[in-house]
Amino acid sequence: MHAKITTDRGTMTVEFFEKDAPNTVANFIKLAKDGFYDGLKFHRVIPGFVAQGGCPHGIGNGGPGYSIDCELDGDNQYHDLGVLSMAHAGRNTGGSQFFIVHSREATAHLDRNHTCFGKVTEGLDIVTQIAQGDTFSVKVFED
């Protein structure tokens, strides 16, 4: 299974870490299929760090109305360029907000603290072009 994230800057293809973060991937896919992400904004963009989205209010304080547990023990729990990872307000408080990593150098401290659940495999150049306030949508495809 993979997804296409269409932004104001272009489209990125994402492959999921289903083996390493099965519950997080299932949650993201469910939200995407339900249309939860359609038209939401990247509300937090810090160049050289991350582009974060998934808040239904567009300001970083909202979610889907529930929390999911972190999954931090898999092999792919390293915040490299293009990795998708769950944002949270503390361990096991993630829901819908996620971020896309801009740089390994600035995000190594997030390893095994935030669940990495996928990686951009096409359109990697778009990751660093995303601007705060840009909108996005997610479409999931069966492999």
Regions found by a protein language model. Name each.
Residues M1-D143:
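Cyclophilin-like peptidyl-prolyl cis-trans isomerases
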